[in-house]
């Protein structure tokens, strides 16, 4: 009888330890995208250029949009930093054999903007960007997203190649059904 009682107590103890380990593991979300990813220099429609950086830490996804005023990504103009909540969906295998996943990102209520040139400071102050008219060089401010945008969801699909090349597509209303592997703006290399 004592042996049976000891087995029951030991079983209860071990199962409660297992539950604790499982719940702790659930709190720490790690994805295959964990880390920092960066685009090459690409040209915008106004002939300015960008280099974008994505950083994934757990369920937080941060996008840094580095804008340049020239055509060679040499002269910084402004930096925008936008933070999202990130969640993964179903896994996907592409015709190429590469894998990926559907994902959803939720926009926070604010983003950071930093003017990095005198012309950006002047433009920000003239337009009272984000309601401020006291912008200073290389000094970030928190800006509010439009009411309609704050908390909104964006839907995406990514393809991962060899663990260090990421192709991503994002849409506003529904999950995309493909990714463009020839678009510099949506091609990221692991740093």
Task: Report residues per predicted region.
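Short, solvent-exposed coil/turn segments at beta-strand boundaries
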Residues: 33-34, 53-62, 157-167
């Amino acid at each position: 009888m004592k042996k049976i009682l000891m087995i029951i107590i030991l079983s209860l103890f071990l199962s409660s330890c297992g539950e604790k380990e499982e719940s702790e593991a659930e709190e720490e979300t790690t994805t295959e995208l964990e880390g920092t990813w960066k685009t090459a220099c690409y040209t915008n429609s106004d002939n300015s250029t960008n280099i974008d950086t994505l950083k994934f830490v757990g369920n937080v996804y941060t996008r840094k949009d580095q804008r340049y005023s020239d055509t060679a990504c040499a002269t910084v103009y402004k930096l925008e930093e936008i933070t999202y909540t990130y969640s993964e969906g179903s896994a996907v295998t592409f015709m190429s054999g590469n894998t990926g996943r559907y994902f959803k990102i939720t926009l926070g209520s604010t983003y950071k903007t930093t003017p990095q040139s005198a012309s950006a400071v002047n433009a920000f102050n003239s337009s009272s960007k984000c309601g401020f008219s006291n912008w200073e060089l290389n000094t970030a401010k928190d800006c509010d997203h439009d009411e309609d945008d704050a908390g909104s969801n964006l839907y995406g699909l990514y393809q991962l190649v060899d663990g260090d090349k990421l192709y991503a597509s994002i849409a506003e209303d529904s999950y995309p059904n493909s990714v463009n592997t020839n678009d510099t703006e949506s091609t990221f290399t692991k740093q």
